[in-house]
Amino acid sequence: MISTMKLPLKSAAKIRITEPMSGIAEIRLRAGRPSVCVNILGDMRICSDPFSASEIADCFAEICRYSVHSFQEEIAQGFVTLDGGHRVGICGTAVKNGGKIEMFKDISGLNIRIAHEIKGCADEVYSRFFSGGTRSVLIAGKPL
């Protein structure tokens, strides 16, 4: 069972990992298919029986704290952020208004991306900017 990650989802109780798997990066929930856990190396394992469409809908409602309209801006971007920095990508039919996505309907899948620390990922950047006595740096860029 996924309990150490403290995902605020009742559906997490259905997810089981039968073999050791460290560094889980994603949990993919898809209607009519088993959920899949993916670790930071890209290894995938089936970790539940298939989720029904109603279980996916219930999970989505729970992710939105049963107030989907409160998360409309995030949903329009295709994801919802959970406490702890975890993000849930939404797969469904986009509803557009004036060429802009407003929301999703017929949600068929959720991709839970587990927030995790990557130690040392900025060591080179840090030494490059701060070795000469620079005291502040602003780094801006388009999200990947």
Residue ranges, per PLM feature:
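N-terminal accessory targeting/assembly segments
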Residues: 1-84
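Glycine-rich phosphate-binding P-loop
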Residues: 133-144
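P-loop NTP-binding catalytic core
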Residues: 58-62, 66-133
